């Protein structure tokens, strides 16, 4: 799997993501500076990592979404290429129009930084094939603006089309306000586009891929991507 990690000013999770991708795919990802106008030849996966691109000025991800490299990302996605946006990357995907909705301030107006539980809603996508439908995984979050919001029609479409892949839940998989850490609509933690090749999610699976972290639940996402691409080759 040949992956490319986009690097914007203020991003700070690119090395975590690179370590996870290399560990699981066996290949060193390329680092692509935001001012580039093309992606490395043969790229299979584009990743937008977490951090605070451009200091989160204007809105989280708003400036990064207008970077030169994003035209290449849009073309890549339109051609069926896999795109993963984590945390600030999710915000950039929404601001760029690759995903619907927006990420707002957390409901309690506080930065959240701890492990959470997610329920995997489907196992038949490139981003979830490493899990079972209904499986509960534990991964970290670290955000102040992860409250997913969209108009009612968009939410209905996301639900009706099965485009919600991850939801905040309890350790046993229950969904509800008690377990919805940031107030996101329908406890949404991760969604895909209509075609299913672009995923945005607030939690950080890349930080739970090694035993030293005390949990390896994030491995399934990356292992599933590798398996999907190997099968498609």
Curated annotation (Swiss-Prot):
Please report the name of this protein according to its UniProt entry.
Phosphoribosylformylglycinamidine synthase subunit PurQ
**NCBIfam families hit by this protein:** FGAM_synth_I, PRK03619.1
The region annotated as signal peptide is none
| Compartments where found | Cytoplasm
Give its E.C. classification number: 6.3.5.3, 3.5.1.2
A biological process from GO: 'de novo' IMP biosynthetic process
Q: Which GO terms describe its molecular function?
A: ATP binding; glutaminase activity; phosphoribosylformylglycinamidine synthase activity
- InterPro entries this protein is in? Class_I_gatase-like, PRibForGlyAmidine_synth_PurQ
* One cellular component term from this protein's GO annotations in UniProt: cytoplasm
- Where on the tree of life does the source sit, at the highest rank? Bacteria
Q: Tell me where in this chain the Glutamine amidotransferase type-1 domain is found.
A: 3-233
Q: Which UniProt keywords apply?
A: ATP-binding, Cytoplasm, Glutamine amidotransferase, Hydrolase, Ligase, Nucleotide-binding, Purine biosynthesis
Q: Does the keyword Cytoplasm apply?
A: yes
